[in-house]
Amino acid sequence: YQRYANDLTDGFVEAEKILQEERIFSSKDLPYTTQLIPLAVLCTLLAEHNRIKTTSVKDKIKQWYWCGVFGEMYGSANETRYVYDVVGVMAWLEDASKTPKTVQEFYFNPVRLLSLQSRLSAAYKGIMARILKNQCKDFISGREMDFTVYKAESIDIHHIFPRDYCEKKGLPRA
């Protein structure tokens, strides 16, 4: 493992950059910590000739990533999925017809949105990241939610309207 330690470390750094582009700024907001492993491996493999920096490659990596999150595919039995995904994504980058298993098997039932009430859910964290990515603004300052605002304002994804406020106003839970 020592032979590849520096390359893998660089891969994790690149994976962090991709996650920040997708508005995942902290480990507590990471939908699946387990999906970070194949993401970092892919970033490591694609570092050669800076392939990971190209838009077309990055777009496919992000598509694979979000299919894994919203398909809720990294909750258990991940070691086999790591292999399928790394091999599958690398093949997909060479041949667009070779879609990786996670992208092929992706399915998100919209009814699932009604049950996302816990910030511990990967899909909940994913939705919050997608909201942040789509130019949402801070309620107080009106500034677009970027890394600077996220850190400066100690943004948390657990709720928009505080429970105590809703209860005092008699608002229904759902």
Describe the residue ranges of each PLM region.
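Intrinsically disordered, low-complexity N-proximal targeting/linker segments that flank membranes
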Residues: 69-169, 173
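Short intrinsically disordered, low-complexity coil segments enriched in acidic
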Residues: 1-6, 164, 173-174
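A cross-family structural signal marking well-folded subdomains
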Residues: 1-113
